[in-house]
UniProtKB/Swiss-Prot annotation:
Protein name listed in UniProt: Protein translocase subunit SecA
Cellular localization per UniProt: Cell membrane; Cytoplasm
Purpose of the protein: Part of the Sec protein translocase complex. Interacts with the SecYEG preprotein conducting channel. Has a central role in coupling the hydrolysis of ATP to the transfer of proteins into and across the cell membrane, serving as an ATP-driven molecular motor driving the stepwise translocation of polypeptide chains across the membrane.
Entry membrane topology: Peripheral membrane protein
Underlying gene: secA
Residue ranges, annotated region (Disordered): 794-839
PROSITE patterns for the chain: SECA, SECA_MOTOR_DEAD
Molecular function GO labels: ATP binding; protein-exporting ATPase activity
Subunit organization: Monomer and homodimer. Part of the essential Sec protein translocation apparatus which comprises SecA, SecYEG and auxiliary proteins SecDF. Other proteins may also be involved.
Family the entry assigns: Belongs to the SecA family.
Biological-process GO terms, alphabetical: intracellular protein transmembrane transport; protein import; protein targeting; protein transport by the Sec complex
InterPro entries: Helicase_ATP-bd, Helicase_C-like, P-loop_NTPase, SecA, SecA_CS, SecA_DEAD, SecA_motor_DEAD, SecA_preprotein_X-link_dom
């Protein structure tokens, strides 16, 4: 029935594309007029468009003419003319949607259309790529086009100083990686002077390989952290201990969720070994944390699959691309546990200073768009999480690639023998072959087998990152054999060499199905670009992880019943259905996991947005006296509310405790006594305290002079930053154990939201209390500067680290003044009283 409806009415994607084709015809009609313009006249169109926008004209009204101008400029500068389908891709981006365009269809050129149009607004367009190589390449090549049209182009790279970054962001168009844009946002919210900020308000971002950035990387938050000096000996002790534990008896592994849990026997062994009564007692949180991390490191994380050891350090391998993520570390003590497992020097744990998920970072843009060759399978996620529709753009020429059915073998060894035999036969003809593997270990295993057969080849995995683009670009030449880990080299076109088309084009071999159909489609999509011939074939075994995790037993039993030899493959719809069913289940599970990460981060995000806005307001305002006084009043009101509760009669109030709280917290010592407060109503007490606060605050202003304004700013920044860091850490710890609430029939997310809100309110109160005490009691140094503001947290501010999908920050630091000791304050107050008596 659905097929009949589609035949009669066409699907929604087809209807949208047809509608856009009509608009392309209007753009094409402008071509002769635009072509007749001189270079200067073409360039002047940019100023004309800007003027029209300034006068209130909408972007959509100038789209046709602007796209025609970009197309003509591209012909003159780059020698490339946008195809009609590329114009449609540009329209989709302009509408804030995702253009799905097959490999080789020219996504980089498509982006120039929407980038130019939106850059005319003068608010800055960010073009986001998956790595710095692509950002540099695209900004260099496409920058010539934009410069010709009178627009400026910046490159935002890791390692630039703040001034260079400000220049890059001030440009009309800025290229960079998702990580660098996200880390700059976090660093901007750690600066001590508004002039140190580098980003403008987030206007429009076009994300290349949008599925990789918004989906594959979505579960990994961006984190800026500093090392906290704690003992590392316990990591070695726990690593040695967990080697004695036995699977099933002492611990269980959930391969689908990748978690490990101690059994009752395992818990007993820990308690006996460490001579404690209850591992889950709050006094043993640290030990529990270390044991869990050591067990995860021992049984869930494999060397040369999840990480490699290089020059005495554990380097994470990106599970999606196979690239080494130098500088990135696992959090929550896991990285230290792996270092202990490998017998390396354990580096100290880090404390999170700032963090955000890519999901919440990119959702802050006023408008968002993306491009990729594979998005349709994840359309639901793009829509629900980011509000992004996916539009599949037709190819310029029909796809000629032939995708053969999967070949399934009983064992992994038989599968690899078949792969090698296929490579040898095709290599004899000179047909280029690209082999996709899912791990460094598998790529090196295959490489050894090919060496034994005398087949020359290139291995492209995380260990050859520098040569990545060069190797991929040459994968289509006569006789080339390239082994690539996952989708390494993504973003680089594979063009066929001379005579290769006659041999059948590039042949793709997949050695294992990925848990996501999208990744499999990406591998296939490397062949058959722009109407070229090509082919693909996946070789599977019943021992592959996906098959093993999701019930290969039935198929294995069938193969045994048929008496099949180890080297004899089967092509079966049953197998294909089983694989696709497994992939859909994993995709659904991964979507739920990413959605879960976002739901929890949304709690932090609401708090983060408020804190960062308040912090920005602090930086931008010169006079914070009202802010400071309101914080002191809030502390005062809480003290009165606590010690003079409405439900008690005044005779039962603890007036001495209230006097102590006032004198120690926000007034000079001995200002208030319980005797003074006796017989007063709560409102009268508040009035008295407020009058004293106002009087003493005015005295502070007179004593300190003009520098009190800077002093207030330093104190408030220090309080906000230090308490926010503590809050991030506390929220992370809450999150780690919140799932246990499910055992008590409570919804963990609701519990996290409720407790997170209470903790946030507690953080705000702590900020107010610290500000009140410092402003009313601290000694102000003569050379007051905003430095060392976040010192005192046990953090080495000179060695900050970033993690997420990689790189590192270099935030500025700032300072505070210490309060006088009790004796000094008392002496000062007595002197003040003597002076008052004289007057």
């Amino acid at each position: 029935m659905l097929g009949l409806v589609k035949k009669i009415f066409g699907d929604s994607n087809e209807r949208e594309v047809k509608k856009m084709f009509k608009r392309v015809e209007s753009i094409n009609a402008l071509e002769p007029t635009i072509k007749a313009l001189s270079d200067d006249q073409l360039r002047e169109k940019t100023a004309e468009f800007k003027a029209r926008l300034a006068n209130g004209e909408e972007l959509d009204k100038i789209l046709n003419e602007a796209f025609a101008v970009v197309r003509e400029a591209s012909i003159r500068v780059l020698g490339m003319r946008h195809f009609d389908v590329q114009m449609i891709g540009g329209m989709v981006l302009q509408e804030g949607r995702i253009s799905e365009m097959k490999t080789g269809e020219g996504k980089t050129l498509v982006a120039t259309l929407a980038t130019y149009l939106n850059a005319l607004m003068g608010k800055g367009v960010h073009v986001v790529t998956v790595n710095e190589y692509l950002a540099e390449r695209d900004s260099s090549i496409m920058g010539k086009l934009y410069n010709f049209l009178g627009l400026t182009v910046g490159l935002n790279k890791n390692g630039l100083n703040p001034e260079e970054k400000r220049e890059a962001y001030a440009c009309d168009i800025t290229y960079g990686t998702n990580n660098e844009f996200g880390f700059d946002y976090l660093r901007d919210n750690m600066v001590l002077y508004k002039e140190q900020m580098v980003q403008r308000p987030l206007f429009f971002a076009i994300i290349d390989e949008v599925d990789s950035i918004l989906i594959d990387e979505a579960r990994t938050p961006l984190i800026i952290s500093g090392s906290a000096n704690k003992s590392t000996e316990l990591y070695y002790i726990c690593s040695h201990f967990v080697k004695r534990l036995e699977e099933e008896k002492d611990f269980t592994i959930d391969e689908k969720l990748k978690i490990v849990n101690l059994t009752d026997d395992g818990v007993s062994k820990v308690e006996q070994a460490f001579n404690i009564d209850n591992l889950y007692d709050t006094a043993h949180i640290t030990l529990n944390h270390h044991i869990t991390a050591a067990l995860k490191a021992q049984v869930l994380f494999k060397r040369d699959v999840d990480y490699v050891v290089q020059e005495g350090e554990v380097v994470i391998v990106d599970e999606f691309t196979g690239r080494l993520m130098v500088g990135r570390r696992y959090s929550d003590g896991l990285h230290q546990a792996i270092e202990a497992k490998e017998g390396l020097r354990v580096q100290s744990e880090s404390m999170t200073l700032a963090t955000i998920t890519l999901q919440n970072y990119f959702r802050m843009y006023e408008k968002l768009a993306g491009m990729t060759g594979t998005a349709k399978t994840e359309e639901e996620e793009f829509k629900k999480i980011y509000g992004l529709d996916v539009v599949v753009i037709p190819t310029n020429k029909p796809v000629q690639r032939v995708d053969s059915p999967d070949l399934v073998f009983k064992t992994e060894a038989a599968k690899y023998r078949a792969v090698v035999n296929d490579i040898v036969e095709r290599h004899k003809k000179g047909q280029p072959i690209l082999v996709g593997t899912i791990s460094i270990e598998n790529s090196e295993r295959l490489s050894q087998m090919l060496k034994q057969k005398g087949v020359p080849h290139n291995v492209l995995n995380a260990k050859q990152h520098e040569r990545e683009a060069e190797i991929v670009a040459r994968a289509g030449v006569y006789g080339a054999v390239t082994i690539a880990t996952n989708m390494a080299g993504r973003g680089t076109d594979i063009q066929l060499g001379e005579g290769v088309a006659e041999l059948g084009g590039l042949h793709i071999i997949g050695t294992e199905r990925h848990e996501s159909r999208r990744i499999d489609n990406q591998l296939r999509g490397r062949a058959g670009r722009q109407g070229d011939p090509g082919s693909s074939q996946f070789f599977l075994s019943m021992q592959d992880e996906l098959m093993r995790r999701f019930g290969a037993d039935n198929i294995m039993n069938m193969m045994d019943r048929l008496g099949m030899e180890e080297d004899m493959p089967i092509e079966s719809r049953l197998v294909t259905r089983a694989v696709e069913s497994a992939q859909k289940r994993v995709e659904g599970s991964n979507f739920d996991a990413r959605k879960g990460v976002l739901q929890y981060d949304d709690v932090m995000n609401q708090q983060r947005l408020v804190v960062y806005k308040q912090r920005k307001d602090i930086l931008e305002h010169e006079n914070l006296s009202d802010v400071a006084l309101n914080m002191i009043y809030a502390v005062m009101e809480r003290a009165v509310s606590l010690h003079c509760p409405k439900e008690e009669v005044p005779e039962d109030w603890d007036l001495q405790a209230l006097a102590d709280a006032a004198n120690n917290g926000f007034l000079y010592e001995e200002t208030i006594t319980a005797k003074m407060l006796k017989g007063m109503e709560a409102e009268e007490i508040l009035e008295l305290l407020k009058a004293e606060v106002d009087k003493q605050y005015k005295q502070r202003e007179e004593e300190i002079g003009e520098s009190i304004r800077e002093f207030e700013k330093v104190v408030i920044l220090r309080a906000v930053d230090s308490k926010w860091m503590d809050h991030i850490d506390a929220m992370d710890q809450l999150r780690q154990g919140i799932h246990l609430r499910a055992y008590a029939q409570n919804d963990p997310l609701r519990e996290y939201q409720f407790e997170g809100y209470e903790m946030y309110q507690g953080m705000l109160a702590a900020v107010q209390e610290e500000v009140a005490m410092y402003i009313m009691k601290a000694e102000v140094s003569q050379n007051l500067e905003r430095q060392d503001v976040i010192r005192g947290q046990g953090i080495d501010m000179d060695n900050l680290q970033t993690s997420g999908p990689s790189d590192r920050p270099d935030p500025e630091t700032s300072g505070d003044a210490d309060p006088k000791n009790r004796a000094q304050r008392r002496a000062q107050e007595q002197e003040r009283k003597r002076q008052n008596k004289k007057q």
